Amino acid sequence: MEFEQEYTAEEALNIEKEFTRLKGKHYMDHAGTTLYAESQIRAVHDMLAQNLFCNPHSSPLTGKLLQQVRHRLLRFFNTSPSDYSLVFTSGATASLKLVAESFRFRPPDEPESSPDEGAFVYLRDNHTSVLGMRSVVGTERIDPLEPEELLRHLKVSARCSGGTKPSLLVFPAQNNFNAAKYPLDLVEEIQQNGLSGYDDERFYVCLDAASYVSTNFLDLGRYRPDFVCMSFYKIFGYPTGLGALLIRNGSEDVLDKKYYGGGTIKIMLSGQNLHLKHDDLVTRFEDGTQPFLSIISLLEGMNTIQRLIPAANGYRPMERISKHVFSLAKYCYRKLGTLQHANGKKAILFYSDTRYETRDRQGGIVTFNVLKDDGSHLGFSEFAKFAGQHQIYVRTGCFCNAGSCQKHLGLTDEDILMFYEMGKVCGDDTDMIEGRPTGTVRVSFGYMNKKEDVNRLVDMINDCFVSKAVSNVAMVSPIRNVIKNEGIALKAIYLYPIRSCGGYRITAAWPLTERGLKYDREFTIVDSNGNPLMRNKHAEMSTIHPKIDPSLNFLILTHPFMEDLILKIRKLPTEFNDGESIDLGDAAAAWISKALRMPKLRLLRTSATDRKPPHKLLMINWDAMKTLSDDEGVESDATMSWLVDHFRGSLIVEGKAEEDLQGWKEVKIGKKRFKVQANCSRCPMIHVDQSGEAIPADSLKAIANVFTKKIPLGVHLTAVDEGFPEGVLECGSILEPVRQSDSPKAHIIKDSVSTRYNFLVK
C-alpha cells in the first residue's frame, strides 16, 4: 500500500530533529493541538530574553511590533489590511462569541424592539462553540441547517439576494469531527444569493476556520467571508490562549459591540454613562491590554513553518502540509480498512463523509470505532487505555461536535437525553450504553507525523483487538437477564497494607471495617517532600511485600534481598484527626530507603477516616481469567498470580467462568452486602510489567488478547450505605448476586423523554 511522500529526505530529517521528545511516542491528536518545534521555543526564549517589551499602551515600539505581527498574519492568509482587519482574541471560541454578541439582526434604522429581525442559521455539524452562539445572538429566529441543505446551494441557481434583514450563517471550513471539507465557494454563493426559504434576508457569512487552518492554506484573497474565527495554537503549537477574528472591511457595519474596555474609546465620563468608541475597528474591538508577548511569539511560529516546509513546486508551506496530512490520512484509512477478524468480519467502522479520494473534500483526520469479531463495538475508553500503553496519543469521544457524532452514531435526540438520564455527560469516559457506542476514536495528523506513526497504530489495533482465531468462548452481553450463581464462592482475600506495594494472600478470614479491609492501604511511603510514592512511577515498589500478623499486631516488611523488618502496629491515639499521619520511625525509613534505593523515604500510617470515600474493593473472577488465559495459551500459574497482583484485586472469587459480573447490581458475600459499581478499569494496564518480574513477552501479548473479549474479569464493589458492613469476610463464603434487570429504567426514560424535554426537542 503506497504512501505519497511530500517532503524531501532532507526536509523529513530536519523536521525529525525538531521533535526529539517524540522518540518512542506516536502523537496523532493534531486536531486537538499541534506541537511546537524545539527551535521555535528556543527562538521565542531568546527574543524575550534579549529584548525589553513594554505594555503597548506605554510603548509605541511594542505597538509597532504588534502591527508588524498583524500584517504578517494577514499575508499568511494571502490578504492585507486593505481587505481585512485582524482582531486578536483568546481563541476561536472567543471570536465566535464576539460575533454572536455584536451582530445586529435588524436594519440600522429599526429599533431593537422591532419584530423585523434577521435569522441566525448554523450547521448541525458545527463545533459546540458555534452552537453556544444560540444563547446570546440577538434574534429569536434560530435555525439549524443540515450539511446536505447547505451543499445544495452550489447545485441549484438561487435567487439574487435582495433582502434587507441582516442575517448570519455560520459553517466550518472543515469539520473537526472527521475533517470533511466544505466548498469555500459557498461563501460568495451565500453572500450574493442568500439561502432558499429566506427571501427577505441579507446573509453575512461567518467561517469557523479553527480546524481548517491547522493544516490547510486559507486563501482570503480568493474566498472572502465576512468573519473568520481561528486559534493559533492549532497552527503553530505555541502560544496557547490566542486567536483571531478576521473582519472583512465593510462588514463591521453590522457589528454593534456593547462592552468597552481599556484602550477602546476616544472619550468617556466616569460619572455619566457617556463614551465614544474609537473609529479604528481593531482598536474598538480589542478590550484592555492584549497578550503582547504571546502575539510577538507568533513570529517564530510562522518562521518555523516556512523554514521547515518551504514553498516548493508552486505550493505554499501550508498547502504542502495539507498534501502531507491528507496522504497520511488516506494511507491510514486504507490500512485500517484491511483489518478483519479471522471469521471475515471487518474490524474497523469508519465515520467519514468521503472515501479519501481528494484533499479538496477531505483533510487529515480518520474517525472510527473498533469492532469485535461478533460485530459489537469496542468502547472508546477501552481503546484509549490500550493506545496509551503503546505510547499512541489520539482523541476519543465526540470532540465537542455533538451534531456530527449524533449523526454518524445514528443517535436520536431522545437517545441523547436517555443517555443523560442514565448518567452520561459530555467529556466522561462512559463509552457504551446498552451496547451502543457514545463516542468514537479520532486520529488526526500534523506536519511532523510520519508513515511509521500510522503503521504503529495499525499494528497495535491488529495485535490487541483483531482476533486471529474464532474464539470458542461465548460472547456475553454487558447486561444479563439470568444469573447462574451455583457454586460461586470467595476463593481468597488479598491485602495491600502499604499503598502501591505488593499484597499478600489470605485464605481464611479477615476483618472488614466501614472503610474497607482492615489495614488495607493504611500505610504510605513518602519522599523527602512528603509526596506519596506511586507504583506507576516506581515499579520496584512491588518488590516490597508487607504482611500483617493480626494476633500480635505486627507489620512485617519483606523483600527478596533483605532481612524482614517487624514493626509494632500501635493503637491510634484518640485525638488522631482526619488528615494526620504517624511516622513509623527511623528503622522503617532506613529499611524502605534501602529496599527502593531512594534516600530520605519515610513510612507513614494515615487515619482511616482520612481515606474518604470508602475504598473500592476490586473483585476478580479467577475461573474466567483462568479459562480465558488457557484459551490464549497462558498456562503458567506464576503468570496467573502475577495477574492478580498486577490488577491489585482484593476479593478473588471462583465458580462459573462464564459468569458476567457486570450483570450484577448488588452481591452478598456471606452475610455482607455490597453494591456492584463498575467494571475494572485496570485491564488495559497488562502491557506494563510493573513488578519487574520476568513475564515473557509472548505471555504479555496473550494476556492482552484476553481483555479484547467481552467477558469482564473484575468489578468494583462499594458500600451500599455510607460505609461497608463491619464484621468478618470469610473465604469459602457463597456469593448471592442481585441481578440487574433488563434495563427497565431505560424504558421509563424513553417513555418520559418527549414530555420532560419537549421544551428542548423541537
From Swiss-Prot:
PROSITE patterns in the cross-refs: MOSC
Keyword Lipid biosynthesis set for record: no
Keyword Transferase listed: yes
Pfam family, one: MOSC
Cofactor: pyridoxal 5'-phosphate
Domain MOSC: 590-738
EC number: 2.8.1.9
Function description: Sulfurates the molybdenum cofactor. Sulfation of molybdenum is essential for xanthine dehydrogenase (XDH) and aldehyde oxidase (ADO) enzymes in which molybdenum cofactor is liganded by 1 oxygen and 1 sulfur atom in active form.
HAMAP family to which the protein is assigned, alphabetical: MOCOS
Family: Belongs to the class-V pyridoxal-phosphate-dependent aminotransferase family. MOCOS subfamily.
UniProt-recorded name of the protein: Molybdenum cofactor sulfurase 2
Organism listed in the record: Aedes aegypti (Yellowfever mosquito)
Species lineage: Eukaryota, Metazoa, Ecdysozoa, Arthropoda, Hexapoda
